[in-house]
Amino acid sequence: MAAAPVAAGSGAGRGRRSAATVAAWGGWGGRPRPGNILLQLRQGQLTGRGLVRAVQFTETFLTERDKQSKWSGIPQLLLKLHTTSHLHSDFVECQNILKEISPLLSMEAMAFVTEERKLTQETTYPNTYIFDLFGGVDLLVEILMRPTISIRGQKLKISDEMSKDCLSILYNTCVCTEGVTKRLAEKNDFVIFLFTLMTSKKTFLQTATLIEDILGVKKEMIRLDEVPNLSSLVSNFDQQQLANFCRILAVTISEMDTGNDDKHTLLAKNAQQKKSLSLGPSAAEINQAALLSIPGFVERLCKLATRKVSESTGTASFLQELEEWYTWLDNALVLDALMRVANEESEHNQASIVFPPPGASEENGLPHTSARTQLPQSMKIMHEIMYKLEVLYVLCVLLMGRQRNQVHRMIAEFKLIPGLNNLFDKLIWRKHSASALVLHGHNQNCDCSPDITLKIQFLRLLQSFSDHHENKYLLLNNQELNELSAISLKANIPEVEAVLNTDRSLVCDGKRGLLTRLLQVMKKEPAESSFRFWQARAVESFLRGTTSYADQMFLLKRGLLEHILYCIVDSECKSRDVLQSYFDLLGELMKFNVDAFKRFNKYINTDAKFQVFLKQINSSLVDSNMLVRCVTLSLDRFENQVDMKVAEVLSECRLLAYISQVPTQMSFLFRLINIIHVQTLTQENVSCLNTSLVILMLARRKERLPLYLRLLQRMEHSKKYPGFLLNNFHNLLRFWQQHYLHKDKDSTCLENSSCISFSYWKETVSILLNPDRQSPSALVSYIEEPYMDIDRDFTEE
């Protein structure tokens, strides 16, 4: 329940299994002897031939060998289990044997997960390894799937208790023995069958955790539309089950290759998209559609995401779930952390948790809520945080999917945004307590901490929600919407249509909207905080799209520009990611806004400060080029306006004066083209290409395009590499045509952000790529024949 969304699907032990295998095989003290029984079993497991199961040996033989090898009697138990689990068995004896096997594996797995990998001196091999080698995993799969077999028209049944034992043993083996999870993942019919076991509350948690671990290593994504009665299954989940189910959904609705989306080359992504078009919707897209077709699914997620701590499940129910965790190892670390929190707070609050003894039956229930079973408040909060992590992740992925507009409508209708606003101070951005939950092996500032992960997931959701969508105004309250209208009225400009169309019953309530709350915590964030990047991205997404003067002024009035400049100039920020996000935000905030440039000049009021600012810009144009683009566009607009206020800013602003110089523009242009190549273009650095195009489009408007190309040629020659820059630019523009002429969304974004029609973008690129060497605006006119290299094939190898 508490896994970070960015790592959804990763099992507790998966990253450590190689160590267990080393420990197991190292027990021979060298290369195994020919004829060694374990080696033969291992070969049989790999080939499917020869020795593969305990049933192929006599009990006498296994007992004798066990005395020498100390296998804890596991092979003999598997032999008995096979005998007592036939189709006509009543499974009573079978269940008794499972209860003998379970503790032999569970303690070993618990030690493995908690990194206390101390194999007892009596055993040479881990019990889980022996269990798997003698066919235990395959046998349990068969037992679990017996209900799918019909005899004389009647389906077999096994008890929930027996299913729980089988699932626990399977999971423990997956944790400790390398390769078991992958083998289970290859059994697609078994994976689909596991979903049916989630219909029972008694087996839900074990099943969900095993499925999550299996899906995390499955090469091909499972299709949810193959799960029998998916809609009924999900609709019958209670809220706790639905929150846990979101862990599985995180693996099934996310595209498998999106981990480092900005780092993948556009060539590779374009090739993948072409391939995808021929194959139809991806499994992730099919799964998203399947979920959205379930009645009430998104509404329930919104309720879970916005549920207050006081509304969450009662203590007894939570205790029961924790008892499950006690033997369910994927959550052992979380349980360990929760118990530490409880112990710390009990010293101050005299409140503690009392678990029933391990053997207590479910029928007897758990102790009633009393002074001894009251949960500390911080524990309740952590419980809720771990749920919300998964839910917010799923909502975020759905918001970025093909059905984005449908999801947007539902999220707005079910009041997700005002609900999150009400939770902001008490849960999402609450102050850290001394006993804030910290996972085993991590510290309080680690990005794996549930507290921190929730904040990042929340910010990612806001970014996805606001990005190029009119619903972004739901982040404000009624008073703030009125403020936007007043700003437009005072400036004598039309009100933003989206503001007028906003349903006031769906906006935030209270004294401050969600955007204002975000600005407040953003300005208080420490310089080294990892949240700065995500906060800036979330606020920038509110400004993206067609530039809105009212939106900019709303943020300027709250001191956002001064905060950004402080971070860039005065805080000595070193993080490239944070600087890039702040440069991007500053560009959107200042674009075409005279008041913003006045505020900039007021803050950057000395040459020393301005030089620090320029140093930050010039240190990495990949990070700062969006700001360069916005200032260049603003300068062009201001120069064409007849207004005293604009004229005053043009004459006083250091930044505008700096950008207006042709040598400055040429320096930026040369470096922007030089730092990118077709083979290295990514979603992150393709903006450098578009910024260079903006500079040349504005030059073309002023009939200065030939001058700029001639200057680029001279700069090339001064570097003693004639043709290297213009050939590269020619190839980049050829790729630009291939990439953008088939991308409706991307082209719309270019048009909206620059206020230059996309047709003008296309015309300018065509003019630059004109093959006529007599054209003064064609790149080939400035590349000398011996250095011409413009027909390079940039197909992804």
From Swiss-Prot:
<keyword id="KW-0833">Ubl conjugation pathway</keyword>
<dbReference type="GO" id="GO:0031464">
    <property type="term" value="C:Cul4A-RING E3 ubiquitin ligase complex"/>
</dbReference>
<dbReference type="GO" id="GO:0019902">
    <property type="term" value="F:phosphatase binding"/>
</dbReference>
<protein>
    <recommendedName>
        <fullName>Short transient receptor potential channel 4-associated protein</fullName>
    </recommendedName>
</protein>
<dbReference type="GO" id="GO:0048471">
    <property type="term" value="C:perinuclear region of cytoplasm"/>
</dbReference>
<dbReference type="GO" id="GO:0005829">
    <property type="term" value="C:cytosol"/>
</dbReference>
<dbReference type="InterPro" id="IPR016024">
    <property type="entry name" value="ARM-type_fold"/>
</dbReference>
<keyword id="KW-0597">Phosphoprotein</keyword>
<keyword id="KW-0007">Acetylation</keyword>
<comment type="function">
    <text>Substrate-recognition component of a DCX (DDB1-CUL4-X-box) E3 ubiquitin-protein ligase complex required for cell cycle control. The DCX(TRPC4AP) complex specifically mediates the polyubiquitination and subsequent degradation of MYC as part of the DesCEND (destruction via C-end degrons) pathway. The DesCEND (destruction via C-end degrons) pathway recognizes a C-degron located at the extreme C terminus of target proteins, leading to their ubiquitination and degradation.</text>
</comment>
<dbReference type="GO" id="GO:0005262">
    <property type="term" value="F:calcium channel activity"/>
</dbReference>
<comment type="subunit">
    <text>Component of the DCX(TRPC4AP) E3 ubiquitin ligase complex, at least composed of CUL4A, DDB1, TRPC4AP/TRUSS and RBX1. Interacts with MYC. Constitutively associated with TNFRSF1A. Directly interacts with TRADD, TRAF2, CHUK, IKBKB and IKBKG. Interacts with TRPC1, TRPC4 and TRPC5.</text>
</comment>
<comment type="pathway">
    <text>Protein modification; protein ubiquitination.</text>
</comment>
<dbReference type="GO" id="GO:0048820">
    <property type="term" value="P:hair follicle maturation"/>
</dbReference>
<dbReference type="Pfam" id="PF12463">
    <property type="entry name" value="DUF3689"/>
</dbReference>
<keyword id="KW-0963">Cytoplasm</keyword>
<comment type="subunit">
    <text>(Microbial infection) Interacts with Hepatitis B virus (HBV) protein X; leading to prevent ubiquitination of TRPC4AP by SKP2.</text>
</comment>
<dbReference type="GO" id="GO:0080008">
    <property type="term" value="C:Cul4-RING E3 ubiquitin ligase complex"/>
</dbReference>
<dbReference type="InterPro" id="IPR022162">
    <property type="entry name" value="TRPC4AP"/>
</dbReference>
<dbReference type="GO" id="GO:0006511">
    <property type="term" value="P:ubiquitin-dependent protein catabolic process"/>
</dbReference>
<dbReference type="GO" id="GO:0016567">
    <property type="term" value="P:protein ubiquitination"/>
</dbReference>
<dbReference type="GO" id="GO:0005886">
    <property type="term" value="C:plasma membrane"/>
</dbReference>
<keyword id="KW-0945">Host-virus interaction</keyword>
<dbReference type="GO" id="GO:1990756">
    <property type="term" value="F:ubiquitin-like ligase-substrate adaptor activity"/>
</dbReference>
<feature type="region of interest" description="Interaction with TNFRSF1A">
    <location>
        <begin position="2"/>
        <end position="400"/>
    </location>
</feature>
<keyword id="KW-0832">Ubl conjugation</keyword>
<dbReference type="GO" id="GO:0070588">
    <property type="term" value="P:calcium ion transmembrane transport"/>
</dbReference>
<dbReference type="GO" id="GO:0140627">
    <property type="term" value="P:ubiquitin-dependent protein catabolic process via the C-end degron rule pathway"/>
</dbReference>
<feature type="modified residue" description="N-acetylalanine">
    <location>
        <position position="2"/>
    </location>
</feature>
